[in-house]
Each structure stands twice: as C-alpha cells, then as structure tokens.
C-alpha cells in the first residue's frame, strides 16, 4: 500500500484526533487487519509527535526495526504483510540522539502475560451479542424504583485455583454468575479488567486500556462473559482507572511537558507517581 493510500485512510482520523474530538481513536491507532487493493496484512499506526523515527519489530520480521512513515500530525504508520494474529511485537521510538526505546503499543488489543511485556497482534473480530432482551428491558425499567444491590469483584482474588492460577472469564461465568444470583445481587461491578502487569494494584495500574488482562482470557472470552451475565438479567459495571496509568511503558517520544514523574514512594504500591 502506497504512502498516499495510507494518508487517505488516516488523514480524517488524524485531523479529528489532533483537534480533540475523535471519540474512537482505537479504530485507527494501533494494529488493524487490512485487506485492500491486493494487500493483506496488518496496519500499524502510532502517535509519537516528538519522535525522530518510529519502528515496528516483532515475530513477523525476526525482531528487526521496520520503519514506519510519518503520515501527518504526529502519526506514523505502515503495513506489515507478513504479520499474523497472535504474533508479538513492540514499537521502537528513535529520539534522534542515537537512542531507541522499545515500548508496548498503547492501543493494542492484546498483550503477553506478565512478566513478558510485548503487544500481541490482535484484531477486533465480528462478535454476536446476545443481550438484546436485556437491552430492551432497560427502556421499560424504572431505575429509580428498581432494586439496586451491587456486588464488587476483583477477578484475581475472588477465587483462585489450588495452584494459584486466577479464574478465567469462562470459569468466572460458571461460578460467579450463579453465586451472584444465589446471594440476591442485581449488579456485578468488576474492578479494572484492562491489561495490567501487577495483580497487587487491583487493576488500577493499567498499561493497555484497549485490552483485557490476559490472565483472565481474550477480549472475545470477556464478551462471552458479558453475554452470559446479561442473559441472566444482571447489569454489569466496569471500573476504569484513567488517573493511574503507567506512562513510562507507553510514552511515545519525548516526554510531554504536561506530564511530571516522581520517583518518590507512593501509597499505591509503586515507586513512581504521575501527575498532569
């Protein structure tokens, strides 16, 4: 695919992104499967406005730096025809001083399980939701006068296998949903399920906002869990932590001036705090 074709695909997205009114940046940034004009592979798009160069490297190119093209507005992109689903990759950020830092893709849909830290090639596959009955019920429900009894769950510690393994989404569906029903709850509130390397953070030190934690399963398996919960007439609530990310794993290019980091100990279990 030519530079002009990439620019045509991304230009409008980039315009709205840089004007602060793109409501679904995950639809163009990150890794997306393409099949157009005889080209089949994955398109990688990275926002790194201060980088001198940006590279993609992974299983598909023997972990050699593959340069991306600067499209416009700080977005770098390229097509990797040899990339396949489930392969690992990282992003190389060249600061222009001879130093390249290797980062995860902050818009990745899947990641390796910690302590490994590569992003995994993954697409947004078509999925059949089965929650239409539940959705229709919400329009007729009087929320003010309906029962409300919320059960908050930390998926990693709610139950564990004897060998210490966490329950997967499929196992949570088989055990958590019946338990909530038996105990008379109306809502299930899941503490953050987005990708995070440290269980002890309760999911609040997030590295991948667009991926579920691989210790529980895949994005598709999470959707199955939601289908089963809504099929049992439960409302799901998902806690999202947007104030305690781990930017030193994802920051693209030179550190923006509005992000300050400190190495002082924090009460959240980390050795570095972040403020904007």
Descriptions of predicted regions:
Residues 1-41, 63, 70-152, 157-164, ...:
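The feature marks proteins involved in alpha-glucan
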Residues 43-45:
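A short beta-strand segment in extracellular, disulfide-stabilized domains
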Residues 47, 69-70:
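Well-ordered beta-strand positions
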Residues 47-54, 61-63, 83:
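Short proline/glycine-enriched turn/loop motifs at strand-loop junctions of beta-rich domains
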Residues 50, 85-87, 184:
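Short loop/turn segments at connectors of secondary-structure elements within structured domains
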Residues 54-56, 89:
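Short beta-strand elements bearing conserved aromatic residues within extracellular beta-rich modules
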Residues 58, 80, 93, 192, ...:
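Glycine-rich, histidine-containing beta strand-loop boundary motifs that form or position
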Residues 132-145, 150, 154-276:
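Substrate-binding/active-site clefts of carbohydrate-active enzymes
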């Amino acid at each position: 695919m030519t530079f002009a074709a990439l620019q045509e695909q991304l230009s409008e997205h980039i315009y709205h992104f840089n004007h602060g009114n793109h409501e679904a940046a995950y639809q163009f940034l990150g890794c997306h499967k393409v099949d157009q004009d005889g080209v089949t592979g994955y398109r990688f798009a990275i926002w790194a406005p201060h980088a001198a160069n940006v590279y993609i490297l992974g299983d598909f190119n023997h972990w050699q730096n593959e340069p991306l093209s600067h499209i416009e507005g700080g977005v770098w992109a390229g097509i990797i025809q040899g990339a396949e689903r489930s392969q690992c990759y990282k992003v190389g950020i060249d600061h222009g001083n001879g130093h390249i830092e290797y980062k995860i893709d902050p818009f990745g849909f899947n990641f390796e399980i910690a302590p490994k830290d590569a992003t995994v090639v993954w697409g947004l596959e078509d999925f059949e939701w089965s929650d239409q009955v539940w959705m229709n019920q919400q329009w007729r429900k009087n929320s003010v006068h309906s029962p409300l009894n919320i059960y908050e769950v930390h998926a990693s510690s709610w139950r564990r296998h004897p060998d210490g393994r966490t329950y997967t989404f499929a196992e949570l569906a088989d055990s958590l949903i019946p338990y909530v029903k038996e105990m008379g709850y109306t809502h299930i509130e899941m503490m953050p399920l987005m990708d995070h390397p440290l269980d002890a953070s309760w999911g609040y030190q997030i590295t991948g906002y667009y991926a579920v934690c691989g210790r529980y399963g895949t994005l598709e398996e999470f959707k199955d869990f939601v289908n089963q919960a809504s099929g049992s007439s439960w409302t799901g609530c998902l806690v999202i932590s947007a104030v305690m990310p781990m930017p030193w794993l994802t920051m693209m290019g030179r550190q923006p001036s509005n992000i300050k980091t400190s190495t002082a100990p924090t009460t959240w279990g980390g050795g570095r705090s972040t403020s904007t």
